[in-house]
Amino acid sequence: MIKIAVCGAAGRMGQRLINSVQEAEGVCLSGVLERPAHPLVGQDAGLVAGCGALGVSISDDLNAVIAGCDVLIDFTAPKVSLKNLEACGLQRKSIVIGSTGFTPEERQLAMELTRNISAILAPNMSVGVNVCFKILKDIAATLGDDFDVEIVESHHRMKVDAPSGTAVRMGQVVAEALGRDYDRVANFHREGITGSRTKDEIGMQTIRGGDIVGEHTVYFIGMGERIELSHRAMNRDMFSRGAVRAATWVVGQAPGLYDMQDVLGLK
């Protein structure tokens, strides 16, 4: 039985994670973490998540929660995730990170912090999205430079980073398949007299509003034809189920930083 702890019990993802751990086979909820002095600290995690009393109280003691688990699932923010990753490293415990908005420097630090533990850092835990990453690579490599690429992503009004980590990864996958430098060709701004579209650029458009869970569409636009690859998240359960799947996979893996492509055998 793999013991899973969840970070961020008060959040929407944290609550879905608690439910998904309870529904999965071969795992159990060993601990739930919230920030110090949060009003939910001390309450039963199952009651907070709406799945009935579990006998697991929400804690604000990071080290104690990590000590009691085999793997920690973290959907918070980059700075918090890196702190939790470092704490897991000190206790030789695995971690699954679903936070988005990491800078290149923060990703590099994450790699350095996984010298002694196995960890997963992925912008999207959905199985469907990760299959899309693989499909995008094949489409881009086949079409080559004859098609323009544009990416449109939509999320709820509360999302704090833009573009989404998933959209960025989609752009990186396409750029890699086409032999382009993503940081150079990604275009996030079009306004006024922009001139003609450059051949290499990958456009990135962001929509924020309401309660959209997450939608991504990649357009491959040619002369007289267009291919659209879309993924729409109907709820957060697919993210939480994917995270639990990742947690069961990462325990026992060799030290290093992995992603969902590794979990699903898509590399």
From Swiss-Prot:
GO terms for molecular function: 4-hydroxy-tetrahydrodipicolinate reductase; NAD binding; NADP binding; oxidoreductase activity, acting on CH or CH2 groups, NAD or NADP as acceptor. Catalyzes the conversion of 4-hydroxy-tetrahydrodipicolinate (HTPA) to tetrahydrodipicolinate. It comes from Pelobacter propionicus (strain DSM 2379 / NBRC 103807 / OttBd1). It is found in: Cytoplasm. Pathway: Amino-acid biosynthesis; L-lysine biosynthesis via DAP pathway; (S)-tetrahydrodipicolinate from L-aspartate: step 4/4. The active site is at residues 155, 159. (S)-2,3,4,5-tetrahydrodipicolinate binds at residues 156, 165-166. SUPFAM superfamilies: Glyceraldehyde-3-phosphate dehydrogenase-like, C-terminal domain (SSF55347), NAD(P)-binding Rossmann-fold domains (SSF51735). NAD(+) binds at residues 8-13, 34, 98-100, 122-125. It is an enzyme of class 1 (oxidoreductase). The keyword NADP applies. The lineage of its organism: Bacteria, Pseudomonadati, Thermodesulfobacteriota, Desulfuromonadia, Desulfuromonadales. Keywords: Amino-acid biosynthesis, Cytoplasm, Diaminopimelate biosynthesis, Lysine biosynthesis, NAD, NADP, Oxidoreductase. GO terms for biological process: diaminopimelate biosynthetic process; lysine biosynthetic process via diaminopimelate. InterPro entries: DapB_C (IPR022663), DapB_N (IPR000846), DapB_N_CS (IPR022664), DHDPR_bac (IPR023940), NAD(P)-bd_dom_sf (IPR036291). It comes from the Bacteria. This is 4-hydroxy-tetrahydrodipicolinate reductase.
